[in-house]
């Protein structure tokens, strides 16, 4: 019974306090009551905290978009995070593109120029995908998590104490208003006592709020370190991607010029019409030696009709008796043969001789 009486009294007191604050707030808005202003330093701290919160949220959300452009994937990760479960690993776009390229290159044949180039590009894309995954993980841990901790932790505490300060300020101003309206000596003494209590509570809450807000400078310093970590992660990522692409470019650039087309006969200048089959056949034969027009080592080799030394890039198993099996890093002699497919050269090792795919070779000076 006593507990029930206590709860009723507390409920009535809380309702009275809430009503008093509502009246004071309304009268302030209508200009019918005075409002205690916070000191300039505290106001500046509150403004700084609010500004920090707004921009931190914007930076955090846009960084998430940068690292994961797919909104559905971001929603999925958010749900798993709220469920305190690890999101399933998913293949990213560079990895998917790389796998498609590798599959296509395998389908076209690694012994063809285009197929071999696709495989190399695919492997590079998959390495870029791995670097992208590492960037996301590092950035989430060292940059996004500290920003989110501030929004969901420190700033929520600041907002809670700020709201409490606002309530204490309303209580103080309501007490001041009641003191002004008090006429009887007994009522005035009670109002003065209430004013002293509310003033003390307001000052105490203002000090608590000020101490919390002064921690924003430390937050900025911490976020600066996190920003440096993010920049370093990006620098590492872009440096890796640049190196991967540079290596790929060198590999593709080391290919003979006819790597750029598996069917470079389509680039041959059209054969003029002839008055006889003999002339047409002669014209076709003469143009067969002009299919490679860019000045490259392979062009020189074919034009001079001589032989060159070549280093084998990869192991190659001969498909039939007309081909020559190769071992990576061995050096063989190669030369062109009139009428041979543009993707092949004739290779010679000792007394062994056979066709070899040019995609497996690097011509030596």
From Swiss-Prot:
<feature type="region of interest" description="Required for membrane binding">
    <location>
        <begin position="1"/>
        <end position="37"/>
    </location>
</feature>
<dbReference type="Pfam" id="PF03114">
    <property type="entry name" value="BAR"/>
</dbReference>
<dbReference type="GO" id="GO:0000139">
    <property type="term" value="C:Golgi membrane"/>
</dbReference>
<dbReference type="GO" id="GO:0005741">
    <property type="term" value="C:mitochondrial outer membrane"/>
</dbReference>
<keyword id="KW-0963">Cytoplasm</keyword>
<keyword id="KW-0175">Coiled coil</keyword>
<feature type="domain" description="BAR">
    <location>
        <begin position="27"/>
        <end position="261"/>
    </location>
</feature>
<dbReference type="InterPro" id="IPR001452">
    <property type="entry name" value="SH3_domain"/>
</dbReference>
<dbReference type="InterPro" id="IPR004148">
    <property type="entry name" value="BAR_dom"/>
</dbReference>
<keyword id="KW-0007">Acetylation</keyword>
<dbReference type="GO" id="GO:0006915">
    <property type="term" value="P:apoptotic process"/>
</dbReference>
<feature type="domain" description="SH3">
    <location>
        <begin position="305"/>
        <end position="365"/>
    </location>
</feature>
<comment type="function">
    <text>May be required for normal outer mitochondrial membrane dynamics. Required for coatomer-mediated retrograde transport in certain cells. May recruit other proteins to membranes with high curvature. May promote membrane fusion. Involved in activation of caspase-dependent apoptosis by promoting BAX/BAK1 activation. Involved in caspase-independent apoptosis during nutrition starvation and involved in the regulation of autophagy. Activates lipid kinase activity of PIK3C3 during autophagy probably by associating with the PI3K complex II (PI3KC3-C2).</text>
</comment>
<feature type="region of interest" description="Membrane-binding amphipathic helix">
    <location>
        <begin position="1"/>
        <end position="30"/>
    </location>
</feature>
<comment type="similarity">
    <text>Belongs to the endophilin family.</text>
</comment>
<dbReference type="InterPro" id="IPR028503">
    <property type="entry name" value="SH3GLB_SH3"/>
</dbReference>
<dbReference type="InterPro" id="IPR027267">
    <property type="entry name" value="AH/BAR_dom_sf"/>
</dbReference>
<dbReference type="GO" id="GO:0000421">
    <property type="term" value="C:autophagosome membrane"/>
</dbReference>
<comment type="subunit">
    <text>Homodimer, and heterodimer with SH3GLB2. Binds BAX; induction of apoptosis augments BAX binding. Binds DNM1, HTT, AMPH, BIN1 and ARFGAP1. Interacts with UVRAG; UVRAG bridges the interaction to BECN1 indicative for an association with the PI3K complex II (PI3KC3-C2).</text>
</comment>
<keyword id="KW-0597">Phosphoprotein</keyword>
<keyword id="KW-0496">Mitochondrion</keyword>
<dbReference type="Pfam" id="PF14604">
    <property type="entry name" value="SH3_9"/>
</dbReference>
<dbReference type="GO" id="GO:0031410">
    <property type="term" value="C:cytoplasmic vesicle"/>
</dbReference>
<feature type="modified residue" description="Phosphothreonine; by CDK5">
    <location>
        <position position="145"/>
    </location>
</feature>
<dbReference type="InterPro" id="IPR050384">
    <property type="entry name" value="Endophilin_SH3RF"/>
</dbReference>
<keyword id="KW-0968">Cytoplasmic vesicle</keyword>
<dbReference type="InterPro" id="IPR035695">
    <property type="entry name" value="SH3GLB1_BAR"/>
</dbReference>
<keyword id="KW-0728">SH3 domain</keyword>
<feature type="coiled-coil region">
    <location>
        <begin position="155"/>
        <end position="195"/>
    </location>
</feature>
<keyword id="KW-0472">Membrane</keyword>
<dbReference type="GO" id="GO:0016020">
    <property type="term" value="C:membrane"/>
</dbReference>
<keyword id="KW-1000">Mitochondrion outer membrane</keyword>
<feature type="modified residue" description="N-acetylmethionine">
    <location>
        <position position="1"/>
    </location>
</feature>
<dbReference type="GO" id="GO:0030496">
    <property type="term" value="C:midbody"/>
</dbReference>
<keyword id="KW-0333">Golgi apparatus</keyword>
<keyword id="KW-0446">Lipid-binding</keyword>
<keyword id="KW-0053">Apoptosis</keyword>
<dbReference type="GO" id="GO:0061024">
    <property type="term" value="P:membrane organization"/>
</dbReference>
<dbReference type="GO" id="GO:0008289">
    <property type="term" value="F:lipid binding"/>
</dbReference>
<protein>
    <recommendedName>
        <fullName>Endophilin-B1</fullName>
    </recommendedName>
</protein>
<dbReference type="InterPro" id="IPR036028">
    <property type="entry name" value="SH3-like_dom_sf"/>
</dbReference>
